[in-house]
Structures are given as C-alpha cells and as structure tokens.
C-alpha cells in the first residue's frame, strides 16, 4: 500500500478508534496515530488492515475546528488529498487538507461505511435483512402479545385477551370459574398492553399470600419482571426517589401495604396505566359502609385509566357485592343498585333470544318477536328469512345467526365490562374420581392426644381442629427428632405400597406443612429408595424450579413430588393425573386449590384423587363433610366459601369432639343449603354473557392461527442463524430443548437476558408447558427481541460485497442491492405501527439503474452469491465508485415512490378502521351505556395524531450489497 505522512486511514478491525493519521513510514512498517483516542498502532505496510479515507464530490466533510465543507472537487499533492468546496457557515469557497479533518469521524451511514472500506460479512447482510423482516412481521400481526406467553392455546382465554388487550385503557371484570385461568387471562392482557405500548406502568394488588405466586407467574409465563413492594422495599427505595413507586415500572404489592395513608397517597401519585386487583370478591361494600380495602381500590380506580378486577363467580358472594365491583369499573354507569337490578331483569329476554340464536333449531315466533323488539333500530327481516329457510346453505344460515347474535352482544348486557366462563360452557375438563383408604388410628397418636388433653391450655376451636386433623404434628411435639412418626403411621405404609404399584405414573402428593412434606420424602427414600422430591415455601424460586423439572422429567425423573400447602400455590402439573391428599385442609377453597394443581383445562386424563385417612377421627368427619355435604372431591364447589362461612362453627365442633347425631345433622343441613345455592347459580347463569365470554368459532380461529405460528420452521431457522452469527453457544440438550450460553467470541460484549450460566429454551410449546425451567422461544420472547435489536441497532450487516458466478451474464456486470427502511417516528403508545410499522423496502439495481427486485426475489438471488474478503471487496468498491454514485440517487427515487404508496395505504387503512370503529361505538352508545366516552375521545384524538405522524414519515438507507458477476 502507498503510504504518506499525514494521510487519513481507518482501521478495518477497530473502527471505534476514529480517523487515523499516518505519522511514520519506516521500512516495511507504518505507524498510525488515532487522535480521537490518543492511541498508536503499528502495521506491516503490505498487510495492514486499513482503508484509505477519501471523500467524493457531493459529500460533506467536517474540519477539526467544527465547520463543514460541501465537497465540489479534490486534488492531490505529495500523496495528500485537498478538498475544495463551500464553507458551511460563510458560504465562501475554501480548501481543506485531509490532515485537518475531524478525528472523531464515524462512518454510520451504510454508503459512508462502504466507501470507507468497512465491509461486513455476506451472512451478516442476510441476517440484518431477516431481522428487519421479522420485526415488520411481528408489528403487523393482529395477534401481537398472544404468541409469546408460555401458556396453553385455550380458546376462551385467548379470546378474552384478544378482545380486552387491544382496547385503550380496558376496564373489565374477569370472573371465570375456578380452574379456567383468570390469572392467565390477566397476564395475557398485561403482556399485550405492554408489548403494544398501550401501557408502560402496571400495579398489581394481591393478597399477601399470593404476592410470590404472581411474581413467579408473571416471570415464568409472560417474561415480565415485576418487583414485589412491601414496607421494607418502600423505605429502601426512598433513597432513589421521594415516591418509591416511581423506582419500578411493574409492581406487585398487597392491600395491607396500601391501607397506610402515606403509601396509598404515593401509589395514587405514581401515574399507573393499568391496575390489576386479584381476589376482588373480598372487597366488602355496602352503600352506607364500604370497607377500607374497597376504598383503597376505589381511590386507585379513579386515577388509573385501565382496571382489571379478578374475582370469583359473581353470584358466589351475592348480587350486591357483584354490583360493587362493577361500580369500581364505571361509577357513572353503575350508580344505583336498584336500577342495576331492574336492568338485569330486562336481560332475561335478551338471554332467551341469544340462546335461540346459538342453537341450530328454527326460531320460534316468540323468539322472532323478541329479536325484532330488541333490535328495533335495525332491519333484521332478511336475516330471519335466511335462518328460517328450509333449503339453503348451512354456512349462510350460520353467518346470519352469528350476525344477529353479535348485534345482541353489542347492544345489551354487560358484555364489554364482564367476562365469565363456567365449566358448563367451556368443554375439555377431565373427570375427578375420588378414592378413600381408611386406616386404624395408631396407639402412639392416641397417647399423644391424651397427654395433650391432660396438659390443658386454652386453644381456639380452629386451633383444636387443626391439631386433630394432623396428629403427626402433635406427636412430634412430644418426642425428640429420633422418634419419627412416619415409622408407624399406616398412611405412610399405604403411600409406599401405592407408589410401588404405580411405578410408571407421576404422583403429586400434597400435605399441609413443609415439615410433613420433608418427613414423607425421608420415609420414601430411606425405606424403599423411591425417587421423590419436595416442594415447599422454604425453597427459593430456583430450587422449586429444579424440583419441578426433576418431577417433570420423563426418563430418570422423580416419580413423586411432595408439596406443602403454600409451596404448591401457583404451580400446575397437568402432566400428572394421580393426586394423593396426605391430609385435608380446613378450608374448601384450599381443597379446591390442591385439586386444581391437576384439574386444569388442558389436563389430558381423568384425575384420580387418593385420600388415606385415619378412621373415627376428625379426618374422617371432615372427609364426609366435603364428600357428602359439598361433593367437593368430584366436582368444583363455587359455593364452598359461603358454605364454610355459614357452617364453620358447627363443623369445628363436630371435628373437635361431636357425636354421630351432630355429624348427621350437619351433613343434612349442608346438603340442603348446597342444593339451594347450586340451583340459584344455575338460574342466574347469563347465557348471553357466556356466549360473549368464550368467543365460539372466533376463539377457535385465533387458536388455530397461533398453532400455525408455533409450527413456523422459517422462524426457527432465522432465530438459530441469528444466535449463530451473534456468537451464542448452542448445546442440544435433547427433549426438544437447547442450552444457550454466552461465548468468548460474541459479536457484542453483552446480551441482555442471557445469563453467564446459560438458559434452556425450546421452540415447542408442549415441552415448555411441562417444564418450568425451559423458556418458550417465539418472536415475542425477550431473547429474540434483544437479538433483533442488537443487530438492527448496530452497524452489523449494513455493507457487503459478493460475487455472482453466472456465465449467462457478462463478467464484471454490477448489481446494487439496497435495503431501505420506511418509518415514522412516534411513541409506541400511538399505535402507529399497526398502520405503518418499520418496513424494509428492497431495491435491486443493474448498472443502468433498472429496478429488478420484482423479477429477482431475495432468497433465490442470495443462494447464488459467494462471499469475498474485506480487502478485495474494498478494492472492488473503489473501482466501481463512478458507477455507484448515480445508482444510489436512482435507488432512493424508487424507494421514495414505494414509501409514498405505503403512507397512502396506511392513511387509508387507519381512516377506514378508526372511523368504522368510532361510528360503530357512537351508534352503540345510544343503546348500550357500557360504551365509555373516554374510548370515543381516545379514537378521535388518535386519528388526528396518527395523521400528523404519517405526514412526517421518513426513508432511511439501512443496508447495501454490491454484487459483481465473475466467471472464475
């Protein structure tokens, strides 16, 4: 290479050093000073990884004094270039020697990098283009936010999330029956709102005991990192901000914390976008005396735009409390309880009409009259004729039924604010088969009970009952650790024999306390060497994950998982179908929670519930109350909470020492009250609401599309290539999983979310659902999003030179492939990406400036190309400069035309969709007061904002590939 003192060169391997100056040429070595960093580098003159920096007419260069020069011509003297042109500040003609160029110059634009010889590898150009296409594909999907979470594709859950998650500031009550996944629905909505930019700050309020469960659920299922706030955390955060709630975007806290006026005032002032309240049915309210908890949530709901309330079945705790929760969502709409009751009575006609439309039979005259009256502002006669016709296509009839049903849903009832699915309306649940195993009471327990009675001491009825239900705990209190209750308890003998006879089955065992769980594991291990693992509240999240993964492993995994009551909260093990209840909880809700670990939608097998119990004890009496009084083992019992509240005192007396007559009397009264409550709930079912809540065929269509996305092998290939190019180590672990680890040769110093010890991932949803320790990789996963951002946010792949070996074309034929990005800068919350997401525009020019992109697709063209090394590529670019400059101008013309078309289409789509939705909601508002004025105002403002953003749309050159034909 010809070097001269004062020449400006750039390092091909360390471009961050800026512009270098040749300061010494001696023998076969050259020394370059990089003034921006003050560093020297010495190179061999023949093999220096350096590129000469020479600008061309039309370029703008900056002097070391800060002023710019628009280059008109350049001359050379003694090996140094002198630039001549117009001074940016004075407008005068001036000259600037290259020695006086700004040292801090960076070649960020692709064309600058190309001419500076900063040429990237061929595969990096390809991955950059693929990344831009993936980002565009994700942004344009109307299912954005639904694919990424690690949840089963359950139609009613996806339907509710799809409907609610797309709204501006949704305010809804999620009231599905137990086991139908309210937490998942809330998580899906939160995930959608965050991913689409509709929300940025979220506050979740839960009971104390559920804070950890929500933290785990949000992280494991939705990749959302919430922070748990308690009083200690608030004090600690005060060092960073006067208002501790401003130190995090996503917060979980308990109602107890917010009962304190100081903390509530801070929460009210924290600008939340979305408020989520779990167990909202415990917020007590009467018109005269609302509870403190209710007042806390009411105050927050008045200042937070979006509110999700998660509650038990609305009728479970009475109609007045149901009204109170609706009042939190929209106090203007639900202002008077009596008016609400009167309106609810009018829904009965709507429900009857809806049920008729939802079936297949012809409509009765009464149903037709009812529909005509309910939809009086619309001519429904043509639809009725279609439904009643004899010889007509069934699909047309179904479409007519669906249309009228949608009209009813839009105009009547609480369908926009309340979603409630029941097991009666959602299919796919397994049977619950109950098996009880009586055993004689061990003498050791009887002795411990007598000693305890002699020692006396006043205890509450509840404490006495709890003691009677767990005799092993009482025994252990009187013995030292060398005397283990599990050595003589017949339930342990039974458990060992049961596991030995079901060796091929996974068995979940639940006991009330961690000590009991640990003792059972010790018994199984020491007596029979049975592989079991424990799961209790004293373990960290990582330890629980490992235990869950060990249990889930098909080969070499644990046969049994032994959980404590609290430790099992929030964890589901649908892959198992045998549940052993080693003891019974006193609360029916806790019993349902235990069974709910297996009895979830998505469970493939019938659930076998096994209960070993001690005869003639409190255990047997409680078993009878649950089984004969509530039928709580074989069916869910939504009224369990109410029944326990009503019969708690009688039940506790029976457990502590009641006789047979008292037990019989209790069972009779419980059965009678159970039937009353069940009948009332059946009568209260709102068929119209159920139809709206489960989504029908529309919900199934959403799930089918998501399932197809899961099978997208192109996505899997693109993501694997992305990690390959970044330099992420990938180890095939088997069982559809890969371990990702950072390597020493990664393209970027850090990869956020990829820990030093690695992360196990899978592209298979079923695998991820069965293993808590394996992440589900989709386009929405942070590891994929981060990878896309790392590539597209850097210079990676912005320039490339390739050879096309094709003897049908003359050698030396040049092609210039340009990738432009059409974009409009706007906040994510504006939703502009729905109409004009960042869109890659590909232009493929021949040397005459003709665009061949429509005739030559990217994939087939890319497969024919061969890479060239950087030095040869740089020489080819230098030799081709006279041809390239006019081609760039031509390429921009083609791209600008494409952008103009995209903007016009985006404007038309935006106007059509938002105007249509606005017109629909405005017309509905006249007949359905559930349409909030805020939603209408939001749509009007959004149309104006989006139009302004579209006017400011821009075109940016993102990547360049120069291709030359060779016959060698």
Swiss-Prot record:
SUPFAM superfamilies: P-loop containing nucleoside triphosphate hydrolases (SSF52540). Its EC number is 3.6.4.-. GO terms for molecular function: ATP binding; DNA binding; helicase activity; hydrolase activity, acting on acid anhydrides. GO terms for biological process: regulation of DNA-templated transcription. Pfam families: Helicase_C, RapA_C, SNF2-rel_dom, Tudor_1_RapA, Tudor_RapA. Residues 163-332 form the Helicase ATP-binding domain. A motif (DEAH box) lies at residues 278-281. SMART domains: DEXDc, HELICc. Keywords: Activator, ATP-binding, DNA-binding, Helicase, Hydrolase, Nucleotide-binding, Transcription, Transcription regulation. It is an enzyme of class 3 (hydrolase). Coiled coil: none annotated. PROSITE patterns: HELICASE_ATP_BIND_1, HELICASE_CTER. It comes from the Bacteria. CDD domains: DEXDc_RapA (cd18011), SF2_C_SNF (cd18793). Belongs to the SNF2/RAD54 helicase family. RapA subfamily. Interacts with the RNAP. Has a higher affinity for the core RNAP than for the holoenzyme. Its ATPase activity is stimulated by binding to RNAP. Transcription regulator that activates transcription by stimulating RNA polymerase (RNAP) recycling in case of stress conditions such as supercoiled DNA or high salt concentrations. Probably acts by releasing the RNAP, when it is trapped or immobilized on tightly supercoiled DNA. Does not activate transcription on linear DNA. Probably not involved in DNA repair. This is RNA polymerase-associated protein RapA. It comes from Shewanella sp. (strain ANA-3).
């Amino acid at each position: 290479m010809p070097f001269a003192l004062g020449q400006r060169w750039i390092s091909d391997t360390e471009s961050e050093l800026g512009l270098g100056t040749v300061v010494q040429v001696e023998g076969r070595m050259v020394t370059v000073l990089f003034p921006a960093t003050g560093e020297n580098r010495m190179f061999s003159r023949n093999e220096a990884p350096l590129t000469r920096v020479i600008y061309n007419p039309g370029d703008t260069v900056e002097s070391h004094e800060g002023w710019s020069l628009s280059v008109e011509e350049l001359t050379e003297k003694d090996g140094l270039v002198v630039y001549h042109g117009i001074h940016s500040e004075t407008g005068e003609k001036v000259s600037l020697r290259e020695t006086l160029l700004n040292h801090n110059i960076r070649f960020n634009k692709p064309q600058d990098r190309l001419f500076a010889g900063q040429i990237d590898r061929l595969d990096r150009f390809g991955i950059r283009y693929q990344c831009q296409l993936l980002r565009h594909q994700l942004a344009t999907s109307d299912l954005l936010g639904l694919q990424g979470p690690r949840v089963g594709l359950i139609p009613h859950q996806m339907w509710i999330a799809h409907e609610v998650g797309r709204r501006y500031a949704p305010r809804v009550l999620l009231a599905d029956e137990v086991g139908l996944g309210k937490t998942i629905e809330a998580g899906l909505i939160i995930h959608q709102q965050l991913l689409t930019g509709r929300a940025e700050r979220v506050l979740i309020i839960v009971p104390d005991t559920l804070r950890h469960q929500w933290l785990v659920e949000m992280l494991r299922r939705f990749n959302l990192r919430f922070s748990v706030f308690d009083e200690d955390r608030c004090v600690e955060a005060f060092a960073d901000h006067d208002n501790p709630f401003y130190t995090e975007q996503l917060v979980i806290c308990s109602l107890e914390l917010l009962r304190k006026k100081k903390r509530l005032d801070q929460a009210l002032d924290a600008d939340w976008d979305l408020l989520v309240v779990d167990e909202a049915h415990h917020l007590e309210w009467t018109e005269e005396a609302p509870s403190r908890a209710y007042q806390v949530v009411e105050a927050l709901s008045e200042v937070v735009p979006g509110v999700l309330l998660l509650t038990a079945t609305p009728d479970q705790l009475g109609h007045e409390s149901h009204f109170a929760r609706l009042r939190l969502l929209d106090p203007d709409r639900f202002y008077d309880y009596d008016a609400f009751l009167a309106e609810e009575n009018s829904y009965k006609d709507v429900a009857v009409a809806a049920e008729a439309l939802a079936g297949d039979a012809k409509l009765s005259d009464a149903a037709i009259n009812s529909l005509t009256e309910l939809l009086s502002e619309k001519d429904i006669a043509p639809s009725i004729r279609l439904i009643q016709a004899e010889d007509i296509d069934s699909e047309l009839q179904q479409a007519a039924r669906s249309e009228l049903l949608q009209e009813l849903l839009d105009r009547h009832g609480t369908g926009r604010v309340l979603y409630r699915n029941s097991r009666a309306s959602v299919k796919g649940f397994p049977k619950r088969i109950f098996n009880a195993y009586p055993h004689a009471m061990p003498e050791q327990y009887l002795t411990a009970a007598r000693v305890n009675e002699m020692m006396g001491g006043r205890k509450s009825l509840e404490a006495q009952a709890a003691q009677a239900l767990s005799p092993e705990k009482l025994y252990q209190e009187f013995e030292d650790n060398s005397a283990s209750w599990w050595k003589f308890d017949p339930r342990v003998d039974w458990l060992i024999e049961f596991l030995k006879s079901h060796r091929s089955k996974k068995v979940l065992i639940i006991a009330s306390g961690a000590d009991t769980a640990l003792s059972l594991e010790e018994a199984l291990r020491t007596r029979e060497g049975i592989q079991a693992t424990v799961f209790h509240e004293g373990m960290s999240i990582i330890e629980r994950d490992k235990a869950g993964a060990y249990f889930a492993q098909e080969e070499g995994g644990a046969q049994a998982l032994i959980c404590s009551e609290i430790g099992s909260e929030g964890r589901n093990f649908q892959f198992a179908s045998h549940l052993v209840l080693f003891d019974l909880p006193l609360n029916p809700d806790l019993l349902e929670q235990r069974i709910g670990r297996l009895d979830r939608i998505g469970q493939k097998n019938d659930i076998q519930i096994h209960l070993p119990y001690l005869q003639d004890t409190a255990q047997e009496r409680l078993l009878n109350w649950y089984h004969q009084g509530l039928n709580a083992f074989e069916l869910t019992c939504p009224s369990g909470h109410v029944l326990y509240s009503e019969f708690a005192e009688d039940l506790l007396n029976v457990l502590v020492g009641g006789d047979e007559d008292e037990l019989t009397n209790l069972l009779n009264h419980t059965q009678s009250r159970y039937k009353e409550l069940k009948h009332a709930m059946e009568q209260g079912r709102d068929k119209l609401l159920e139809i709206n809540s489960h989504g029908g065929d529309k919900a199934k269509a959403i799930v089918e599309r998501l399932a197809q996305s899961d099978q997208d092998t192109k996505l899997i290939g693109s993501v694997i290539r992305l990690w390959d190019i970044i330099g992420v180590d990938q180890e095939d672990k088997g069982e559809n999983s890969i371990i990702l680890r950072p390597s020493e040769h990664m393209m970027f110093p850090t990869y956020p979310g990829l820990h030093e010890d690695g992360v196990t991932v899978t592209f298979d949803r079923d695998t991820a659902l069965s293993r808590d320790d394996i992440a589900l990789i989709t386009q929405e996963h942070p590891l994929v999003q981060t990878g896309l951002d790392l590539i597209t946010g850097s210079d990676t792949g912005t320039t490339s030179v390739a050879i096309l070996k094709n003897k049908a074309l003359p050698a030396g034929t040049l092609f210039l492939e340009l990738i432009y990005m059409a974009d409009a800068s706007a906040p994510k919350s504006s939703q502009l990406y729905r109409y004009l997401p960042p869109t890659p525009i590909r232009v493929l020019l021949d040397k005459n400036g003709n665009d061949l992109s429509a005739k030559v697709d990217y994939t087939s063209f890319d497969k024919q190309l061969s890479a060239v090394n950087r030095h040869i590529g740089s020489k080819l670019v230098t030799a081709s400069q006279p041809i390239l400059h006019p081609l760039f101008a031509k390429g921009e013309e083609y791209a600008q035309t494409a952008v103009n078309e995209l903007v016009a289409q985006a404007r038309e789509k935006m106007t059509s969709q938002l105007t249509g939705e606005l017109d629909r909601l405005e017309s509905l508002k006249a007949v359905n007061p559930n349409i909030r004025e805020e939603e209408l105002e939001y749509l009007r403002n959004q149309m104006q904002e989006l139009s302004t953003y579209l006017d400011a749309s821009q075109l940016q050159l993102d990547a360049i590939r120069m291709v030359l034909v060779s016959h060698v």
